[in-house]
Amino acid sequence: MPFTGQDTLKTRRTLTVGDKEYDYFSIEVAEEAGLGDVSRLPFSLKVLLENLLRYEDGGSVTVDDAKALAAWLNTGSSSNEIAFRPARVLMQDFTGVPSVVDLAAMRQAMADMGGDPEKINPLNTCNLVIDHSVTAEFTGTADAMQKNIEKEFASNMERYTFLKWGQTAFSNFTVVPPGAGICHQVNLEFLAKTVWTEEEDGKTIAMPDTIVGTDSHTTMVNALSVLGWGVGGIEAEAVMLGQPVTMLIPEVIGFKLTGKMQEGILATDLVLRVVQMLRNKGVVGKFVEFFGPGLEQLSLPDQATLANMAPEYGATCGFFPIDAGTIKYLELTARSQETIQLVEAYAKAQGLWRDADTPDPQFTDTI
């Protein structure tokens, strides 16, 4: 699957990080090419703009799509549809099994027609985390966890055997086994990279990490500046097979955070208040993006609590920009130094980095 288009606006540039070179599609160059002052876009829309610049092929994505997104600045809204291609798909075992069954059926059909069944593979990276089969039949003893895992394997042996076959049979498809944690936790702590890379024609392409998942709380990873949300199983399969998510360019509500939480106040207290405010505002079908000096006082796990609750306040996602806290969390969770250095360098090159001196973006409305 191609990860780049025809680049009509000539925005492709090279970024050197350490001793490695990455190609990327520059938002700054797009601005110089006549798109307008896109540096004022919300960070979440900059991620969508980069996606359009990278996949612009004159067909499913055109220069007019990028211009329409840039024109969003005029009114803070748009009636234009765009084709968004996420970098990854996240599944859990209940919603993911039917997708693997469909892929297996496609392979069987290919074999029946005399073709090579091994040509049937996900085109985008797909991670399936087995976490929805957890039961707690044993409690209160030192070996309770081990007994529960053994019971889980015994009860779900056919499904787990099938999924293990899927991991060995398909490329771009990995399964995280039972007992590793909840899919959103695994995604945040292990799978997400903030800046994704793919190899194409001997070049390494750097891009924002983006995702759709088959669980509504996929939004949790927006705390790590990974733009994403939950979709249905059919949409997820389509993305696995290289198809875009068609969406209206969303309105973006800015939620300004100031000050810091007092001692004894927890992230759950904060999120309940935020949910109340956003429900009163009405943010269904919209992006929420958090900004303001208060971001520096929130740890990334606390930000993840706010991002996780996007389905409760009705927004498509609750996005946090890349900042020093993002880098600190990537270090805390033992991401590679190569990844951490790339995230900081790429974010600064693309205008996706936020610090105390960064001007506030232009939003549809603010709270």
Where are these regions (language model features)?
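Fe-S-dependent hydro-lyases/dehydratases of central metabolism
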Residues: M1-I367
